[in-house]
Amino acid sequence: MPNFSYSDLLPLGADATKYRLVSTEGVSVVKHGDKEFLQVEPAALVKLTHEAIHDINHYLRAEHLQQLTNIVKDPEASPNDRFVAIDLLKNANIAAGGVLPMCQDTGTALVMGKKGQYVLTTGKDEVAISQGIYDAYTKLNLRYSQMAPVTTWEEKNTGNNLPAQIEIYADSDHQDEYNFMSVSYTHLTLPTIYSM
C-alpha cells in the first residue's frame, strides 16, 4: 500500500515574475486585537478581475515571448516550428494593442482563488469576481462563448460570458495573501492580488 502524500492543487513554486500593481484602492490593513488582517473591498476584486481578463486575452508573459523567440533562433528548430513561433509572435504583437484578443474564442472564465485566513472581504467574493468578468466581456472586444439552456433542445448565448467557474479555497500556508489564478481557454496568468 502506498504511503499517504498530500499536495496542494497547483502549488506555487519560486516566482520571479514581474507583476504590475493594479491598484491599492479598496485594500487596507485592519487590526483586531493583536492580529492584523488584510481587508479587500468588493470593488477591488471587481477591478482586479476585469484587469486579469483583459491581460490574459491580450498579453503573453515575457518568459513566454522569450521562449517563442528562442524557437525562431534555434538552429535545430524545423521550418514548421519557426513558422508557428513567428505567427504566435505576430499574433501577440497585434493582441498587445489591447483591441483584438490573442484567440477569437476567449473561452469560459475559470477563476481559482486561495484566500489566507487573515484576509477579510465583505459580501460574496464570487459576486464581485463575476461582476469583473461581466464588465470585461461587455466592455472589451471579447467574444461571448457561454451558452445557456433555454429548453431541453434550445440554447442561447448569455451575452456576457457568465456564468464563470469560480472556486475559492482557504489557504493557511499564506495567511495574509489572496492569490488568484484566472484561466481563459488557452491563456493563463497567476497574479498575487495583495499581501501584507
Protein language model regions, located:
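Short coil/turn segments at secondary-structure boundaries
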Residues: 64-68, 101-104, 145-149
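Long amphipathic N-terminal alpha/beta scaffold segment
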Residues: 81-87, 92-119
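Solvent-exposed alpha-helices and their adjacent loops that cap or buttress functional pockets
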Residues: 77, 91-95, 100-104, 157-160, ...
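Short coil-to-beta-strand
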Residues: 175-184
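Conserved small/polar residues in nucleotide/adenosyl-binding loops
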Residues: 186-192
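A generic, well-ordered mixed alpha/beta core segment in the N-terminal half of proteins
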Residues: 107-174
